[in-house]
Amino acid sequence: MDIYSTYFMLAAVREVPLEQSFFKNRYFPTDNAMDIFGTSRVLADYKEETQKRAPFVLPRIGSIPGTRDGFSTAELEPANIAVSMPLTLDQLQNRGFGESLLSQATPAERERHFLVSDLAELSARISRSEELLAVNTILNNGTTMRHRTDRADVYEDIGVQFYNGTNNPTQFTPSAKWTHSTYADGKWTPGSWYDDICAMIHELTQSGRPAREIVVAQDVGDFLMEDGWILAMLDNRRAEMGRINPTELTEFVYQIGSFNFKGRVMPILVSDGTYVGDSGSDVAYVPDGTVIVIAPNVGRGLYGAVTQMETDGHFHTCLLYTSPS
């Protein structure tokens, strides 16, 4: 059996455990039946949400016809994420990672081991790129993807934005640097952060979209947990202003608790996950100073098909999140 055949590798890919992904899976889930296309291009539908209501009508009138809201469709070519792992003869002849010092493994056995471990590593790297793509889309209402070549100085930046014009309507800029809450004469005065978050929630709900949770960078989470008013209100048994209940959602995202923002009790999630950037240093998925007001399932993760020539001389098309090549 050729372990590098597409059929063998497809079966192996399905068995590889997926890297933990928070932003991609929570906010851009993929439906296997609807979101994986059999072509290299995908169709993305966009529809503005409204808060229209039904009218009150006299019984003898019957009903008043309403109008359907339109939508727009864009044909997109998904980003091409491709990475490979070379395997050399000396790696097969020498002891591998985690292998017994007195191992009698043959090069053929080591080759199969490398195939499985390499697929797991490559799958994790691809998942991190998808996670970064999801975060950038949330923060910028679009993203710019640098498509590289085998030369560092030759590349092409390909961008996409999900709004018209030059100003991103989903971006909120505070009028001033955040300040902590203050206590005087037996009364707390909320810091500027409180009104800013309430304004973000209001803007989102006014546009017809739900606001269910708040995701912040690590430094913002530390700032909030150091605020005296938050700590005082969380400890106030006379009113349910909030609660501290640290919960780990993934390895890199955890919930520090919930807080009442003018009647809306919102969970506060902190993201401290990082990836290795092009420079080789760790980069946070969510940059310092970032606050995101959002709800799960705000979008969809669409995938196009991958067509490639196999050893039989014919082209084969793969419909899968990750396609071996």
Positions of PLM-derived features:
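N-terminal alpha-helical "arm" segments
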Residues: 1-41
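Assembly/oligomerization interface modules of large self-assembling protein complexes
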Residues: 30-101
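Short His/Asp/Glu-rich catalytic/ion-coordination signatures at enzyme active sites or charged loops
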Residues: 97-111
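Internal, well-ordered alpha/beta segment that forms a basic, Gly-enriched binding/recognition surface
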Residues: 111-130, 135-136
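Short, glycine/acidic-rich hinge or "gate" loops at secondary-structure transitions
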Residues: 131-151
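Extended, solvent-exposed, turn-rich assembly/linker loops in the middle of proteins
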Residues: 152-244, 255
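Extended oligomerization regions of viral-like shell subunits
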Residues: 207-307
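Conserved small/polar residues in nucleotide/adenosyl-binding loops
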Residues: 321-325
